[in-house]
Amino acid sequence: MKNTRVRSIGTKSLLAAVVTAALMATSAYAAVETDAATTGWATQNGGTTGGAKAAKAVEVKNISDFKKALNGTDSSAKIIKVTGPIDISGGKAYTSFDDQKARSQISIPSNTTIIGVGSNGKFTNGSLVIKGVKNVILRNLYIETPVDVAPHYESGDGWNAEWDAAVIDNSTNVWVDHVTISDGSFTDDKYTTKDGEKYVQHDGALDIKKGSDYVTISYSRFELHDKTILIGHSDSNGSQDSGKLRVTFHNNVFDRVTERAPRVRFGSIHAYNNVYLGDVKHSVYPYLYSFGLGTSGSILSESNSFTLSNLKSIDGKNPECSIVKQFNSKVFSDKGSLVNGSTTTKLDTCGLTAYKPTLPYKYSAQTMTSSLATSINNNAGYGKL
């Protein structure tokens, strides 16, 4: 009798502990859902809170429910929790450029937080488009870069694709955190040839353009991609872009990406405590450069880690100079970064013009070490929140 009672008490205690743990986890995740940006440019201009003021969160696990939760252009506060993988095509293959344009571009309204639950927040076969809005948060998501079913041909440039995994277009106060963007199941070695040229079906991973401003990209992972992040889409768009396109990158990982991490026109970029992994001789994604300086673009790099195999001298410059590609700008400064484990001052010999901005936000760039680089690599991307 006593043993039975003891077992009963033990079972009840175990159940109580399980229930308590579940409630604590639910409570903790609810707190994450309402997080506001606390770092970088997204803290400015009134801050970035997404859907924090929503009365309750909505769970979705298919494209129909996702569109319903977004509710078109409705700008009331909303938190959308992605609990299962979402195929934006709805399982119906795109048949043409017009069909893909009509069905694959999902517009996100103002005052929205989209957050994945655990490792379930996955999007394939489409793009998340933040256009003409403000105050949007994307967290704990995996987005596979879309495959263009009808690339266009440009004389002298070959086949070119449309569609990016995510787009920030003429929007302000955007926070992208713990997001992974990757070519995933369709890597560039699967390209075919058409009319004797490579049939390119990927465009960018993330575009930030047309006067967008106050953006922070943190703890995210960009992997297995060629033209990764473009900030400022055209040399002729200075009237809209000048003084804007202010973006902070920190604690991100760029793993086997060929270029544009990022490439910037007109904007002011602050990149600290990021990790760059690549190989000039990689068979699919050969490393070209990390930072691209386009027209009137400027970059401040602090305490980043570059582990890059087979770097070579270009135009007689130090091999490390290939990290920064000068298009129509030379405004760049670095301090405290490591290149292949060693502190580098050699970027100062690359014909660059020092960039020393006065930043309006507080931040702490940790001293880069191999252990810190490992920690950043282990904690960036979706499923790590």
Swiss-Prot record:
Function: Involved in maceration and soft-rotting of plant tissue.
Region annotation (2 X 6 AA approximate repeats) ranges: 177-218
UniProt name for this protein: Pectate lyase E
InterPro entries: Pec_lyase (IPR002022), Pectin_lyas_fold (IPR012334), Pectin_lyase_fold/virulence (IPR011050), PEL (IPR045032)
Catalytic activity of the protein: Eliminative cleavage of (1->4)-alpha-D-galacturonan to give oligosaccharides with 4-deoxy-alpha-D-galact-4-enuronosyl groups at their non-reducing ends
UniProt-listed Pfam families: Pectate_lyase_4 (PF00544)
Compartments, record wording: Secreted
Key word Electron transport present: no
Family, per entry: Belongs to the polysaccharide lyase 1 family. PLBC subfamily.
Record's keyword terms, sorted: Calcium, Lyase, Metal-binding, Repeat, Secreted, Signal
Extra facts: Pectate lyases have been implicated as pathogenicity factors which induce maceration or rotting of plant tissue. PelE is sufficient to induce these effects under laboratory conditions.
Binding site for Ca(2+): D164, D207
Pathway recorded for this protein: Glycan metabolism; pectin degradation; 2-dehydro-3-deoxy-D-gluconate from pectin: step 2/5
